[in-house]
UniProtKB/Swiss-Prot annotation:
This is Large ribosomal subunit protein P2B. Residues 67-87 have a biased composition (Low complexity). InterPro entries: P1/P2_N_sf, Ribosomal_P1/P2, Ribosomal_P1/P2_euk, Ribosomal_P2. One of its GO terms (molecular function) is identical protein binding. Residues 62-111 are annotated as: Disordered. Keywords: Phosphoprotein, Ribonucleoprotein, Ribosomal protein.
Amino acid sequence: MKYLAAYLLLVQGGNTSPSASDITALLESVGVEAEESRLQALLKDLEGKDLQELIAEGNTKLASVPSGGAAAGGASASTGAAAGGAAEAEEEKEEEAKEESDDDMGFGLFD
């Protein structure tokens, strides 16, 4: 992902056909080592392709991926014991607390 981001950054900066050395120089300028094999694989995959078409294709693929969770309406719709509903609410609060504690999900900009 970092190689693709560097490639796109160079293209946006005016370099219409970034080379492996261009991408390596950009990554090293921010302290990231470039793996030559991955970089060559990316350049081979992008060779002869229009970036705008690739971005449009990626957007359609991302749109088809489910990204939201199901609504938690089971506890409010049930007519069971109050203790059962309280236990479910407690579990939801614990899940929310876990989600909030991992905001960056362990990813950096160029990791």
